[in-house]
Regions:
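Extreme N-terminal leader/anchor segments
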Residues: 1-22
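Amphipathic alpha-helical repeat scaffolds of TPR domains
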Residues: 22-51, 77-94
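N-terminal carbohydrate-binding/catalytic regions of secreted carbohydrate-active enzymes
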Residues: 51, 62-69
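TPR/TPR-like alpha-solenoid helical repeat scaffolds
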Residues: 55-56, 160-166, 185-188
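Alpha-solenoid helical repeat scaffolds
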Residues: 67-70, 110, 144, 176
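Alpha-helical adaptor scaffolds
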Residues: 80-165, 180
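TPR/TPR-like (Sel1-like) alpha-helical repeat modules
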Residues: 150, 166-186
């Protein structure tokens, strides 16, 4: 398993010298690489790590990343892409039982969707968050919207949400739909 070490998080900050002085920016590709690495292990509940040490490193990285992004997204008009990444990280933090991550994920997804109600990824990930938080009934509308916006992966979470609510027929329909687009996925 490859997890990023806490000290490498600082590679996110890029410093450039300009005519007006130093300018700092985020290396989005590196950020996405780190988020994707954490997602492999904490994107779903229960989380899966090879060791307790790997989990501790992921928690430390996630807390640091979330804190860095929190500064950027707390302005009056945050970048939607960064707000989605922040919400996603806190969704993972929720899965890792990090204090405060649940509220941060919830607030970030709501804020993002208030400004971008047709954002396919935001609808999908908020639906995943709600479903994994024991709120399957609330997850359904977001997952349905994600599907209508082209996110075929949402069919699996929607099927599982229907199953959690005891609606076996709708669950089967959604899981079959998911399987149609993802025939090699052994989870169905």
């Amino acid at each position: 398993m490859k997890l990023f070490l806490h000290s490498r998080v600082w590679k996110l900050l890029q410093k450039q010298q300009t005519a007006t002085g130093e300018h700092y920016s985020l290396d989005i590709r590196y950020l996405d690489k780190m988020v994707a690495d954490i997602a492999v292990h904490a994107g779903n509940y229960p989380v899966q790590f090879d060791s307790a040490a790997d989990r501790r490193r992921a928690v430390a990285d996630l807390i640091l990343l979330s804190g860095m992004l929190e500064i950027v997204v707390n302005g009056p008009t945050p970048d939607g892409g960064l707000l989605l990444r922040y919400a996603r990280l806190n969704r993972f933090g929720h899965n890792l039982d990090i204090p405060g991550a649940t509220d941060k994920a919830e607030g970030s997804f709501k804020r993002l969707l208030a400004g971008q109600p047709d954002n396919p990824e935001a609808n999908y990930e908020y639906g995943l968050f709600l479903a994994s938080s024991g709120q399957a009934a609330l997850a359904i509308s977001y997952l349905e919207k994600a599907i209508s916006l082209g996110v075929s992966e949402a069919s699996y979470a929607l099927g599982m949400s229907y199953l959690a609510l005891g609606d076996r027929q709708k669950a089967i329909v959604q899981l079959q739909e998911y399987q149609r687009y993802h025939p090699k996925d052994g989870n169905v």
